[in-house]
């Protein structure tokens, strides 16, 4: 779950990390009033969306008058911002962040992720701030300095100082960086984050460090114990089908293809998508119904897949272990009866109660294509799409 920049900065402030004075505004009038609270210009106005690349898309601007602030707010509030990280529709803009402009001398990068290989929280710092860290990692990986947090000892001030020295910071900046490092590490651990970035972390012309931007992602599996973060969730920034799936504890990710996939198990789901691609098809989604699938969840999964207008056929691939194939069959029958299906449905059932599931589908009278293997299923669903 991602948060907006203004929400990330609110959390930064609570953990003792410096950020520009700013206000999130929902109307042009609020934006003008925010400028008055901040004081004399120039100011920076930023569209608040869950996507990078806002500046290049016109969603970030330095302005010198309140009239310009109003014009920016009127131009963007209620509209959609399209960046290289969004789809063609873009993301809706419901808030504008108005901040005091900062005199920048240098731009740095500081971020943290959970590294699965080491099973540790790993901090990354670089002198190449203001650009995508992925690009830096690809082109000049030697400019990224890493620091691993010991899960027993926790973050230590000396680790922050060590990173500061590697970034070429001196004097008071070393202490400032160490404080930001400790605040960010504490925030990461206490709030069950999956990712956090300050990009850029700037050195001002006065020699001070300020968190100029903030990107924060929470671990969705830990939200049950983070009620404050749950309240910050902006569902308007998420895919409607993905949000609906999450309510039913379904793992769904929308893709750009036209073959809907319903599978149990993340590994099998990825393998199913691969074999569909291998035979010339394009998956419309990743959907894992999980091991504890019920008839109701399977029905809802089917409805979510069919709510995508791009879907021209559906492939159901179930290996019955924990989940019973006859329950999957009941869910398919229930979904078809409730929603109505006008696209071909290819079903491959193997394992626990597969014969009973196949019999239920055959007796239902539904127009379902039975597959004998995963390869057969992929070939049949690709052929079904090609014939439409």
Curated annotation (Swiss-Prot):
NCBIfam families hit by this protein: PRK00696.1 (NF001913), sucCoAbeta (TIGR01016)
UniProt cofactor(s): Mg(2+)
Catalytic class of the enzyme: ligase
Catalytic activity field: succinate + ATP + CoA = succinyl-CoA + ADP + phosphate; GTP + succinate + CoA = succinyl-CoA + GDP + phosphate
Residues reported to bind Mg(2+): 199, 213
A GO term for molecular function: magnesium ion binding
One record GO biological process: tricarboxylic acid cycle
Pathway involvement of the protein, from the record: Carbohydrate metabolism; tricarboxylic acid cycle; succinate from succinyl-CoA (ligase route): step 1/1
HAMAP family recorded: Succ_CoA_beta
Keywords linked to the UniProt accession: ATP-binding, Ligase, Magnesium, Metal-binding, Nucleotide-binding, Tricarboxylic acid cycle
Record-linked Gene3D superfamilies: ATP-grasp fold, A domain, ATP-grasp fold, B domain, Succinyl-CoA synthetase domains
GO cellular component: cytosol; succinate-CoA ligase complex
Organism from which the protein derives: Serratia proteamaculans (strain 568)
Gene name in the database record: sucC
Pfam families: ATP-grasp_2, Ligase_CoA
This enzyme's EC code(s): 6.2.1.5
InterPro entries noted in UniProt: ATP-grasp (IPR011761), ATP-grasp_succ-CoA_synth-type (IPR013650), ATP_grasp_subdomain_1 (IPR013815), Succ-CoA_synthase_bsu_CS (IPR017866), SUCC_ACL_C (IPR005811), Succ_CoA_ligase-like_bsu (IPR005809), Succinyl-CoA_synth-like (IPR016102)
Binding site for ATP: 46, 53-55, 99, 102, 107
Similarity-based family: Belongs to the succinate/malate CoA ligase beta subunit family.
Subunit comment: Heterotetramer of two alpha and two beta subunits.
Domain (ATP-grasp): residue spans on this chain: 9-244
Task of the protein: Succinyl-CoA synthetase functions in the citric acid cycle (TCA), coupling the hydrolysis of succinyl-CoA to the synthesis of either ATP or GTP and thus represents the only step of substrate-level phosphorylation in the TCA. The beta subunit provides nucleotide specificity of the enzyme and binds the substrate succinate, while the binding sites for coenzyme A and phosphate are found in the alpha subunit.
Comment on bound cofactor: Binds 1 Mg(2+) ion per subunit.
Residues where substrate binds: 264, 321-323
Name this protein carries in UniProt: Succinate--CoA ligase [ADP-forming] subunit beta
């Amino acid at each position: 779950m991602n948060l907006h920049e203004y929400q990330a900065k609110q959390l930064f402030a609570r953990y003792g990390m410096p950020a520009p004075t700013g206000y999130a505004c929902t109307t042009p009038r609020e934006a003008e009033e925010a400028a008055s609270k901040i004081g004399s210009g120039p100011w920076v106005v930023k569209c608040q969306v869950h996507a990078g690349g806002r500046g290049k898309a016109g969603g970030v601007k330095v302005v010198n008058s309140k009239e310009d602030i109003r014009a920016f707010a009127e131009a963007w509030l209620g509209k959609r911002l399209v960046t290289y990280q969004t789809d063609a529709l873009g993301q809706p803009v419901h808030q504008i962040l108005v901040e005091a402009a900062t005199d920048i001398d240098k731009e740095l990068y500081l971020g943290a992720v959970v590294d699965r290989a080491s099973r540790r929280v790993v901090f990354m710092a670089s002198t190449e701030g203001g650009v995508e860290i992925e690009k830096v990692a690809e082109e000049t990986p030697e400019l990224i300095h890493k620091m691993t947090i010991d899960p027993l000892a926790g973050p230590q001030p000396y680790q922050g100082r060590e990173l500061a020295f590697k970034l070429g910071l001196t004097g008071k900046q070393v202490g400032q960086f160490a404080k930001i490092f400790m605040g960010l590490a504490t925030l990461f651990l206490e709030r069950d984050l999956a990712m956090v970035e300050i990009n850029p972390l700037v050195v001002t012309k006065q020699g001070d460090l300020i968190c100029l931007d903030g990107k924060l992602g929470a671990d969705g599996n830990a939200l049950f114990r983070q009620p404050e973060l749950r309240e910050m969730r902006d569902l308007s920034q998420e895919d409607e089908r993905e949000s609906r799936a999450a309510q039913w504890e379904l793992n769904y990710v929308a893709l750009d293809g036209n073959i809907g996939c319903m599978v149990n198990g993340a590994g099998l789901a990825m393998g199913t998508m691969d074999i569909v691609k291998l035979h010339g098809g394009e998956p419309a989604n990743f959907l894992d119904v999980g091991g504890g699938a019920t008839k109701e969840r399977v029905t809802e999964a089917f409805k979510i897949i069919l709510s995508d207008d791009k879907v021209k056929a559906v492939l159901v691939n179930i290996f019955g272990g924990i989940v019973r194939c006859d329950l999957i069959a009941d869910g398919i029958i229930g979904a078809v009866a409730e929603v109505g299906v006008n696209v071909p449905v290819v079903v491959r059932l193997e394992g626990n109660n597969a014969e009973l599931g196949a019999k239920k589908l055959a007796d239902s009278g539904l127009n379902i294509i039975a597959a004998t293997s995963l390869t057969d299923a992929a070939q049949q669903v690709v052929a079904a799409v090609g014939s439409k």
